[in-house]
Amino acid sequence: MEQVSAAKLAVLEDILESAIQEERKLVVIARFLPEIRAICRLSEKKGLRYSIITGAVKNRDEQVAQFQNDRDVPVFVGQIATAGLGITLTAASTMVFYSMDYSMSNYEQTKARIHRVGQRMPCTYIHLVAKGTVDVKVLRALRNKADLAKTLVDDYRSGLNPFAS
């Protein structure tokens, strides 16, 4: 039996219902395959068709095209390590991070899937983070990495070389 947070699924269900009522498409990103399977089951339970990209999916271009072009496919489910590069998901302007990994590169690249040329709506990012879980640590680590990167760039732009010995 795979363990997946029932609380997160309940929140995601509310987000899905809201998006569908407003006729908006939604991208849901997760790290682990059991979570992805649970998200797919939730979509099926709601009668929603979805596109999916994980490491095992071979027809990625078809999955993306289906999500981008088919009004009857309102949900895209992606694994953060494999759905974060080289695809355009501008049919949606909302992305839900069901779970994340510690890679700042994966995080930024994944966010950029909906925030690219062709996007006509403001982008919204929702992070499902439960107090007292590893999710808090991952989000904190990503924020610290972003702060460090900003500091290094700001120092470099102001004439300080953070890499000089």
Regions found by a protein language model. Name each.
Residues I87-M100, C123-H127:
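A short beta-strand element within the Helicase C-terminal
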Residues I39-R41, I87-A91, E108-Q109, L139-R140:
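Short amphipathic alpha-helical segments
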Residues T54-K58, S99-M104:
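Short, acidic/turn-prone active-site loops that include or flank metal/cofactor-
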Residues Y102-S165:
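A conserved SF2-helicase RecA2
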Residues M1-F76, I80-I87, V153-S165:
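Conserved Helicase C-terminal RecA-like lobe
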Residues F76, M95-V96, I114:
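Short, well-ordered beta-strand core segments
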